[in-house]
Amino acid sequence: MDKFRVQGPTQLTGEVIISGAKNAALPILFAALLAEEPVEIQNVPKLRDIDTTMKLLSQLGARVERNGSVHVDAGPVNVFCAPYDLVKTMRASIWALGPLVARFGQGQVSLPGGCAIGARPVDLHINGLEQLGAKITLEEGYVKASVNGRLKGAHIVMDKVSVGATVTIMCAATLAEGKTIIENAAREPEIVDTANFLNTMGAKISGAGSDKIIIEGVKRLGGGVYRVLPDRIETGTFLVAAAVTGGKIVCRNTRPDTLDAVLAKLTDAGADIEVGEDWISLDMQGRRPKAVNIRTAPHPGFPTDMQAQFSLLNMVAEGTGVITETIFENRFMHIPELIRMGGHAEIESNTVICQGVARLSGAQVMATDLRASASLVIAGFVAQGTTIVDRIYHIDRGYESIEEKFRALGGQIDRIKGE
């Protein structure tokens, strides 16, 4: 398995171009299954999960190619099963189910894999599809969905806020007969992006970005061209990297309006921040950050996908910071690794209390999930000496060309190829 070797300490300074959002590109690629005509999707990041999704769409019979943009023609889809060998590495595969049953009246998806962070049950997806009239069975590790004729619009009140299930229900409802209302819907920018993509193809969706989404079913979706929104988590990760190393950075091709909670906490930490329509600059002027208190919450609250990066910030900050994780259990697996580098922290159930230290020391550490692995790489830039980050396949699932981007900011980082 590949590893990263990181030399520190380094003050990260310069400009970085932000890639398209993985968490919007994935649902959009699956939503393309609903279209009977070709679609062109621009600004799709080059990532392992994206490659897996493109392979999966091809196996279902779609014509998929990448030349700058990703082109998907789901017209010829004639296979309705997403097999285990592709699904096992990626939870997002469950998003194939809604479009398949909505357009073809049948679909089956192997129960998914992905990051090992807590319970992410597919129950909410299944309940939503059942309320739209699908018959669901679980057989031999597969979720199977079928319906006679079209799905029927329904008034669905979600038991808890779920980005994944909101996407599934919204996509399936676009081709249902009649009106669907989703209450307690997730409000993330990536939900809005997926809805905008569907509307480009002829769907009638309103209210995305609020907790109540209304979908007027249509008989078919056509083609279109759509540009995926920038990745707010990648943006936040690079901003934190500059903040913890006392550096100065400009993130370009980004969307400041998707990052209010993160920018507020970086300001609390002592960063000077400026924003334009599609850029954010952060300047620490060589200062150490101040510790901050954070409670993760569904959007527009503080994103759970930025929790690991801010845990690191608190470990090297002045003072003591408390972070409470309310979204996923088991999401502090990076903390013991940071403690091995000299950090001070205590975990009490879903809370981590970090006492800032003046410096970390390079060490061998292991990535456990996507965002945790990014925080370990950044820790390597703060630490004195050499840090080796193992299992970086997690990073490749969610960050495009991360080592090249860090090198352009002055970071010393190399990829060590595994056996």
Swiss-Prot record:
2-(S-cysteinyl)pyruvic acid O-phosphothioketal: residues bearing it: 115
Pfam families: EPSP_synthase
GO cellular component: cytoplasm
Reactions that this protein is recorded to catalyse: phosphoenolpyruvate + UDP-N-acetyl-alpha-D-glucosamine = UDP-N-acetyl-3-O-(1-carboxyvinyl)-alpha-D-glucosamine + phosphate
UniProt cross-references to SUPFAM superfamilies, sorted A to Z: EPT/RTPC-like
An example molecular function term from Gene Ontology annotations: UDP-N-acetylglucosamine 1-carboxyvinyltransferase activity
Keywords, in A-Z order: Cell cycle, Cell division, Cell shape, Cell wall biogenesis/degradation, Cytoplasm, Peptidoglycan synthesis, Pyruvate, Transferase
Top class in the EC scheme: transferase
Main location, first listed in the record: cytoplasm
GO biological process: cell division; cell wall organization; peptidoglycan biosynthetic process; regulation of cell shape; UDP-N-acetylgalactosamine biosynthetic process
InterPro entries reported in the protein's UniProt record: Enolpyruvate_Tfrase_dom (IPR001986), Enolpyruvate_Tfrase_sf (IPR036968), MurA_subfamily (IPR050068), RNA3'P_cycl/enolpyr_Trfase_a/b (IPR013792), UDP_GlcNAc_COvinyl_MurA (IPR005750)
Binding site for UDP-N-acetyl-alpha-D-glucosamine: 91, 120-124, 160-163, 305, 327
UniProt subcellular location: Cytoplasm
Residues that, per the record, bind phosphoenolpyruvate: 22-23
Protein name in UniProt: UDP-N-acetylglucosamine 1-carboxyvinyltransferase
Function text: Cell wall formation. Adds enolpyruvyl to UDP-N-acetylglucosamine.
Pathway, per record: Cell wall biogenesis; peptidoglycan biosynthesis
EC code(s) of this entry: 2.5.1.7
Domain of life: Bacteria
Family under the similarity heading: Belongs to the EPSP synthase family. MurA subfamily.
Catalytic residues (positions): 115 (proton donor)
Taxonomic lineage of the native organism: Bacteria, Pseudomonadati, Pseudomonadota, Gammaproteobacteria, Aeromonadales
